[in-house]
Amino acid sequence: MQLLNFGLLLLPFVAGDLAPQPEPLLAGPSDVVPGQYIVTLKEGLTSAQIRDHKKWVSSVHRANLDSFAAGASGVETEGIMKHFHIHDLNMYSGGFDEKTVEDLSRNPYVKSVHPDQHVYLAKTVTQRQARWGLGYMSSKGKPVPLHSTLVDYSYDDKAGEGVWAYVLDTGINVNHIEFEGRAILGHNAIPNKPHTDEFGHGTYVAGIIAGKTYGVAKKANVVSAKAFDTGSSTYNYILETYDWIVRNITDSNRKNKAVINLSISGAKYQPFDDAVEKAFKAGITTVVAAGNDGKDAKNNTPASSPNAITVGAVRWENTRPSFSNYGKLVDIWAPGELIKSCWKGGNNATSTQSGTSAASPHVAGLVAYLMSIENLPSPSAVTARVLNLTIPNLVKDAKDSPNRVAYNGIQERKFKLPK
């Protein structure tokens, strides 16, 4: 069974150290959660079959707990914990002894059994610099001055109005002045923790999507879906949160007016790739970070999910930062180095960060922006429109990636030159 190295995707900088390209800050070591698993059921099962399967699991688990073999494992297990249903994909998490896991792997209703994983956040530090990313999004990929705050960002004034961006992350400070009351608390999967953002990552990502100053879609609504806290998470919480998002979008009739942002990445983990794919088939668009390993994104989740919009990071002069993943599964490139946005610590706090965590929300914001001004009835239509607007062949060292830079479709762009 495959171990997972998984984390949020911002990189630290020392204040004032702007010239060197950064090395990626790797997330902490990823460990299997002892005795805890994600079970994926085969497609086509009826509700009755799923109910019968769960009864069977409970019976087998109880019997094994009573046996010497289960007791000898030294792991307390609690059986089925949570069920996830995304389109026609059914999964559940659970705490099981080794004998029950063996029985599950042989069950005719079970597609796969994967160990749950600890998921670690990358640490970041603050740097007060840069607003180049927004100007780049409306400049057809023309190089922009890194330190200038005088670059125009041109956009349609609908600016994401009526669209909902769901941010699966560390939470959002919904009271930050950048959100102007357009940010709401959605779901908090972390037990015994308040629905706040003590780490800063989720607030930062949301600011790039929809902040009044730093956002691509300045009138979009953002929904906080908390699956991480200040330390780590597991797929038990990530799948719960993603399942909630898909249900909320569906129940609220927002499929063609909603986008999910996942600024997270780790070693390939098929159950979550499957979940993202099923959301696409259900009519929901997901934008994901390519990852910060400086390697081919095909080995990362959720970047390898075939119908997610996978985003690599580009610098202001159209080069690929050394940290950004690449490859044939990277659909598009967007600003991802020295990007300023909202931060933790106060309702007007800001920070400048780098990583594909910053690139992904630029494209999620672009999706929200386009949804507000055009009739894009499906994720396929959204992806086609986003890619159709891109500017080709600009990124240096794109490796074998599709060489397409994000662009919002506005033709005019001006520089205000200082006197």
Swiss-Prot record:
CDD domains given in the database record: Peptidases_S8_PCSK9_ProteinaseK_like
- Select a single GO molecular function from the record's annotations and give it: serine-type endopeptidase activity
**Maturation-removed propeptide residues:** 17-122
Please give the residues the UniProt entry marks as glycosylated: N248, N261, N348, N388
- Residues in the signal sequence: 1-16
Q: Is Secreted among this UniProt entry's keywords?
A: yes
Active-site residues, Swiss-Prot/TrEMBL: D169, H201, S357
Domain named Inhibitor I9 is located at 36-122
Compartments it resides in: Secreted
**Protein purpose:** Secreted subtilisin-like serine protease with keratinolytic activity that contributes to pathogenicity.
Protein name, UniProt field: Subtilisin-like protease 2
Species in which this protein is naturally found: Trichophyton verrucosum
Which gene is the coding source of this polypeptide chain? SUB2
